[in-house]
Swiss-Prot record:
Keywords: Oxidoreductase, Peroxidase, Transferase
Its EC number(s): 2.5.1.18
Gene: yfcF
Classification lineage: Bacteria, Pseudomonadati, Pseudomonadota, Gammaproteobacteria, Enterobacterales
The species this protein was found in: Escherichia coli (strain K12)
One Pfam family matching this protein: GST_N_2
Reactions listed under catalytic activity: RX + glutathione = an S-substituted glutathione + a halide anion + H(+)
Family of the protein in this entry: Belongs to the GST superfamily.
GO biological process, one term: L-phenylalanine catabolic process
Name of the protein in its database record: Glutathione S-transferase YfcF
Reported pH dependence: Activity decreases as pH is lowered from neutral to acidic.
Length: 214
């Protein structure tokens, strides 16, 4: 059986947290893929000639042969189904309830905590940008993040569900918006996010982002 041709589309700076998530999913699966970029600042993603125009006009966009898919959580779930364990590495928990919880965490991180995303955009994470102090809304959102994360994390475990899963990367990214800016974060969550950030697949993306930014 021939290997599929896989392409992942990213923003030109590799700042997108959702591209990071899709990148890590592909890397952890052990899949070979090509990277292509599109300049969001100039509106290239809004041109009808771009492959992602007929999807959501956002990155990441995954292309596998003649199939195209956008939205990072959909990409991760598709990869888990198409390149399924045990033949391929697992990126979601084996346990049914834990797998559902991981997907809940992913959905929550993408739909909530808007003040953090607005006040601590990912140029803070990948380019060391400095922003104004958190507003009252930002602080309230951070407190919600801390409370939820501390409830989800089992004391003494470095991952959400024992074994690493893709939701760990997504949660660590949200926490690191604050940690890497120097905002006050509970020590337990700093340790968790720092540990997750050392994962090889994450470090490869950070290096790629630094290369583009530098």
């Amino acid at each position: 059986m021939s290997k599929p041709a896989i392409t992942l589309w990213s923003d030109a700076h590799f700042f997108s947290p959702y591209v990071l998530s899709a990148w890590v999913a592909l890397q952890e699966k052990g899949l070979s893929f090509h990277i292509k970029t599109i300049d969001l600042d100039s509106g290239e993603h809004l041109q009808p000639t771009w492959q992602g125009y007929g999807q959501t006009r956002r990155v990441p966009l995954l292309q596998i042969d003649d199939f195209e898919l956008s939205e990072s959580s959909a990409i991760a779930e598709y990869l888990e189904d198409r390149f399924a364990p045990p033949t391929w590495e697992r990126i979601y928990p084996l346990d049914l309830e834990n797998r559902a919880r991981a997907r809940q965490i992913q959905a929550w991180l993408r739909s909530d905590l808007m003040p953090i995303r607005e006040e601590r955009p990912t140029d803070v994470v990948f380019a060391g940008a400095k922003k104004a102090p958190l507003t009252a809304e930002g602080k309230a959102s951070a407190e919600k993040l801390f409370a939820m994360a501390e409830h989800l994390l089992v004391l003494g475990q470095p991952n959400l569900f024992g074994e690493w899963c893709i939701a760990d990367t997504d949660l660590a990214l949200m926490i690191n918006r604050l940690v890497l800016h120097g905002d006050e974060v509970p020590e337990r969550l700093v340790d968790y996010a720092t540990f997750q950030w050392q994962r090889a697949s994450v470090q490869r993306f950070i290096a790629l982002s630094a290369k583009q930014s530098g």
